[in-house]
């Protein structure tokens, strides 16, 4: 919610043939790959290089009030734009932990995204996720969120949502993080299974 001092990691290990390849590069290698000058705001925001000096020079980063300012500017310039929340939103701070995600839910509702999908949200537990989703004023999408017992799409999460912008009809298909029970405690959401489900995704593409 509030601006913080955030240091990017100094290590990102890729397995197999991936070490040293995007996205498994950090620091100077990252700057060189993307042509970012040393000591610049982007250097501070996207690498760990000389973090203390950069933090002293540039201050804290983030804060949803600043995100709102950017969103308002984009919407004023491009009113037909969609705002999509890719997940990892209802977690990560003490206030989020204490409120069971409600602080972030309130703020995201105020930002008025058009749709969202999921990742760490499920660490709140399936009952809390269901409670929040049932009250959302926007679409909660996940074509790959299935009922574990019946191996069928979970009714709570729509696979897709239609929008019309500038006379163009748009279908947004939700894809939650596929390895949820590996990256997060599976006992917190035993009712659900995930996975890539590429065949079901193709069915949804064909359907829309």
Where are the language model's segments positioned?
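Acidic, metal/ion-coordinating pockets
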Residues: 1-208
């Amino acid at each position: 919610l509030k601006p913080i001092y955030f240091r990017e990691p100094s290590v990102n290990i890729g397995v197999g043939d991936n070490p040293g390849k995007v996205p498994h590069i950090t620091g100077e290698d990252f700057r060189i790959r993307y042509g970012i000058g040393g000591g610049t705001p982007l250097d501070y925001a996207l690498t760990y290089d000389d973090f203390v000096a950069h933090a002293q020079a540039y201050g804290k980063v983030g804060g949803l009030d600043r995100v709102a300012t950017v969103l308002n500017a984009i919407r004023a310039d491009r009113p037909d734009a969609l705002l999509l929340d890719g997940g990892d939103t209802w977690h990560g701070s003490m206030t989020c932990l204490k409120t069971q995600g409600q602080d972030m839910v309130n703020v995201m509702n105020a930002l008025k995204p058009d749709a969202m999908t999921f990742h760490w949200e499920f660490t709140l537990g399936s009952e809390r996720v269901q409670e929040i989703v049932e009250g959302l004023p926007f679409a909660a999408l996940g074509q790959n969120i299935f009922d574990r017992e019946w191996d069928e799409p979970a009714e709570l999460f729509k696979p897709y949502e239609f929008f019309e912008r500038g006379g163009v009809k748009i279908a947004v298909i939700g894809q939650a993080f596929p390895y949820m029970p590996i990256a997060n405690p599976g006992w917190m959401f035993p009712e659900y299974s995930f996975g890539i489900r590429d065949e079901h995704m193709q069915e949804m593409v064909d359907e829309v």
